[in-house]
Amino acid sequence: MGGFTIIPDCSISDIAVNEKSVLLLPGANTWNDLKHGAIIEKAGELLLAGATVCAICGATVSLANAGLLDHRPHTSNGMGYLEMCSPHYKGQHFYVDTPSVVDDNLITASSTGALLWARQIIERLEVFQPDTLEAWYNYFSSGKEQYFFDLMQTLPSSK
């Protein structure tokens, strides 16, 4: 995908299906390829089990093709994009025209929402304390030096 060689840690059948699992589906224009069917099927199983599934850009098309966006709030690169790339898409009434959307255990984003999507995933996984997350997001969304120092002040001391 994207010209990268990816060596997975496990096979799709080895992915634990429980509420602690997290599946990240990166953006690309190859998601309509049938070879991705197994991971999209697993995404559906994970969503039903309460696991977190995160999809950005072209990966949202595969979720739409599988009907996984038909009945819950979501976003993508535009409703027209989903309609064009997924002829059976029926989630128009749930489409939210914003860069990234969190609906319980589903996090979707347009390609322009990558930073917000990352923030929402980090928040869901509780990687940072809330003040660190806020400073991290402020710094990376603005590039302002003051937020870099704010971020550094929230991190634990390495002493």
Model region roles, listed by residue range:
Residues 4-54, 58-159:
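Active-site-adjacent pocket-lining segments in enzyme domains
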